[in-house]
Amino acid sequence: YSMIREKFGLNEEDGKLMAKVARRSHQINAVYTWEKFQAMGYLWTMIPVINKMYDTEEERIAGYKRHYELFNTNPVVGGFITGLNTAMEMQAAKDKEFDKASIAAVRTSLMGPFAGIGDSIFQSTWRVITMGIGLSLAKDGNILGPIVFLVLFNLLAEPCRILLPYVGFKMGSKFMLQAEESG
């Protein structure tokens, strides 16, 4: 992750935090409930951010509650939203006037579009193509069929899962800086 940190121009502290967020965002879909969908995974992803940014128990609990709301998007591209919300949480911790409700508003407004893009690319197209290749091998009893499917699918999905949280963080940080400078 240090190479990615350098590529995005992050200091070591922010780079380590974003590495945790990127790794944890892989598990966004691990606990899926019909009440809040991926909220548990989203909260799991944001816990290192909340713990780092806020000192008091009250602030941390408020942060946990803020991120344990309905969340449902494509798990491959959803990391962008976690990165963006990380930048917003960092700004909120620095600026007591920051409207923390905007963090949830941004998350909620991006869930649908990212689900549409991610599902179209990964679930409806790329998965079907790679599954077809894997199945064509497996139908003749070739053990490489499922392996080829997993390798091919993740050749595209894994870089997105790793890099998109950084992209979201960088874009969010840039936006927060511009907003702060413009007043």
Model-identified regions with their sequence ranges:
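Extended aliphatic helical segments
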Residues: 21, 31, 49, 76-77, ...
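Short membrane-interface loop/juxtamembrane segments of multi-pass integral membrane proteins
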Residues: 89, 94-113, 175-183
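Glycine-centered flexibility motif
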Residues: 41, 80-83, 89, 112, ...
